Amino acid sequence: MEELLAELMVLMRRTVFPEFLGQEDRDLDVMSVRSILRKIADEGRADAFVARIPEIARLLHTDVDAIADNDPAVIDRTEVVLCYPCIKVMLHYRTAHELLQLGVPVAPRLLTEMAHSATGIDIHPGARIGEISPSTTARA
């Protein structure tokens, strides 16, 4: 299952951040996400997750914006997406959280543990983070 989940996260990253990763065929990646999810969950849950990808992407873009707008060391948003470990963690968390909400067993916890192992940052898939808004004191 871990190999499937690792592949899922590669696809989710490309699906959510195509503008930063030179994505060529987002529709193909979404179909691949659905295919992987059908191996770990039933068809209804897989389809429900795919329907939530636009909202997951929106939330992750607000995460990127909050970092880019508040960290004076940031050069641009591409740097945040490619280099900041917290974005990897948030991608795993937001994916895992959605799967948990849909009642998919085991996979949500494995996803957050994969991110924890890679970054040292641990967020339980049941945590409620919500939208991260840019600060009113963001740099100009």
Question: What residue spans do the PLM features occupy?
Answer:
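Structural signal for interior beta-strand "rungs" in well-ordered beta-sheet cores
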Residues: 115-140
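Terminal amphipathic alpha-helical/low-complexity segments used for targeting or macromolecular assembly
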Residues: 1-113
